Amino acid sequence: MAISNKQKAAIAAIVLVGGVATGGVLLSGRSAPEEQGGHSESKGHGDTEHHGKQAAEADHKDDKSHGDGEHHEVKKGPNGGALFSRDGYDVEIGTAESKGEARIRLWVSKSGKAVANGVAATGQLVRATGESQALKFVVSGDALESQQPVAEPHVFDVTANVTLPGSSSPLAVRLSKEEGKIELTADQLAKTGVVVQTAGSAKVQAGVQFPGEIRFNEDKTAHVVPRLAGVVESVPANIGQQVKKGQVLAVIASTGLSDQRSELLAAQKRLDLARVTYDREKKLWEQKISAEQDYLSARNALQEAQISVQNAQQKLTAIGASNSSTALNRYELRAPFDGMIVEKHISLGEAVADNANVFTLSDLSSVWAEFVVSAKDVERVRIGEKASINSASSDVKADGTVSYVGSLLGEQTRTAKARVTLTNPQMAWRPGLFVTVDVFGADVEVPVAVKTEAVQDVNGESVVFVAVQGGFVPQPVKVGRTNGKVIEIVEGLKPGARYAAANSFVLKAELGKSSAEHGH
């Protein structure tokens, strides 16, 4: 059987790792005398390998053609595990579900019959991240099973030392698993744009996280009312439209406005008459033709007329109406500032009251990220503290400062409202959007941290893609504090581990593809 160089290298690496783990025990685990006994049926072999009888018959018909020192692929046992043999015993190592969890299992048999009594085993599991786990085996039915469950991902190497009945030295058996590994060559890695960095200590601002929601900036939101009752003649503005200050939103025919404009016109006419009378009486008084009392009365009438005109003008100004003398009942409702129409409660031909909320206008260039703070966290959230806002449904992020913390707790909820004011020039933050608000305190040194974008959600679990030989492995992690740029890893990753820091979403997509293909 021809073995590729890649396979030879892989097996050689397994032999080397296993040799170190077992204190220099060779792959076969035999002493020289046992070797002779174990190969009585395979005289054609000139190497030091050892296989089960079935494996020898199935895969070693060309025994005599093997050269010395050649390594072979690990044989597969009836349970799908790796099969090893010595002194007439077959030992298979694999994984099996037990009590709802994956465990390492050893099946020992002799002459086709299961053997469990008199067999003892210990082992060690080494993950791609370098983490190791000691394994203890106990009898479970007709096999031996690890007391410790094996968590995902199932990418690891296991070495177990199995002491067989009547044997003075243990048999070293090995199992390698690469379930879920995403294989990428160096060229493929370069094309994807995945950037690999090393996990290590970092300064993270100690903080607390709150669920929140984007809301209108109430300081820049207005309910537009007509201030005059009337009938709607036209509505050029629509909901969702961006409008400028002074732009016409609606035109209303109002009898009240007609009365006010008529009052202004009448006051202006009276003013004109009073001015003419005053000028005449002043001239006559100066010429000593008329009495001073007539002059003073004319001056007083002029001043009263001026006051009447000013009063009528201010009434129109207060409601935002012009001094038009043509269409006396035409009232143009205009935008009080630049903003977006977010609500509209007016239509053509409708009769509206003077206090009806016909439009809601909001300047969305600034919004609030509101969140609720429990009583135990109130002291940790203060005005002016830095905060990071992350969208729950997109990759939008922003930094800001806490602008308000309620001074009173709700009687029922025992919580206080707080908010962060955000600039929103691109309109990325839309009111109603759910967000996560991280409020930061003092800097804290954490032993393991990674880039925030390196953490992906896979089936509801936080995952970091760890770089291994020939690809990446999805490593479940438990995250801690974050400042929006780096995030603390509490469990699942050790310092020095190399991980996908940027564009890890590409690996998540590849993982999803491979899972779908595996499902078919």
Swiss-Prot record:
Annotated localization: Cell inner membrane
Keywords for the protein's UniProt record, in alphabetical order: Cadmium resistance, Cell inner membrane, Cell membrane, Cobalt, Coiled coil, Membrane, Plasmid, Transmembrane, Transmembrane helix, Transport, Zinc
Pfam family, one: CusB_dom_1
Biotechnology (record note): In the presence of 2 mM Cd(2+) or 4-10 mM Zn(2+) up to 99% of the metal is removed from the culture supernatant and is sequestered via bioprecipitation. Additionally Cu(2+), Co(2+), Ni(2+), Pb(2+), Y(3+) and Ge(4+) can also be removed from culture supernatants, although it is not clear which efflux system is responsible for all these substrates.
Transmembrane residue ranges: 9-29
Residue segments, region Disordered: 28-85
GO BP terms in the entry: copper ion export; plasma membrane copper ion transport; response to cadmium ion
GO molecular function terms noted in the UniProt entry: metal ion transmembrane transporter activity; transition metal ion binding
Feature: compositional bias, Basic and acidic residues: 32-76
InterPro entries in UniProt: Co/Zn/Cd_resistance_CzcB-like, CusB-like_dom_1, CusB_D23, MFP_Cation_Efflux, RND_pump_MFP
Membrane topology: Single-pass membrane protein
Lineage top rank: taxon: Bacteria
UniProt keyword Hydrolase, yes or no: no
Coiled-coil residues: 286-320
GO cellular component, one term: outer membrane-bounded periplasmic space
Entry's induction text: By zinc, cadmium and cobalt (zinc being the best and cobalt being the worst inducer).
Principal localisation: membrane
Family (UniProt): Belongs to the membrane fusion protein (MFP) (TC 8.A.1) family.
Role this protein plays: CzcA and CzcB together would act in zinc efflux nearly as effectively as the complete czc efflux system (CzcABC). The CzcB protein is thought to funnel zinc cations to the CzcA transport protein.
Full protein name: Cobalt-zinc-cadmium resistance protein CzcB
Source taxonomy: Bacteria, Pseudomonadati, Pseudomonadota, Betaproteobacteria, Burkholderiales
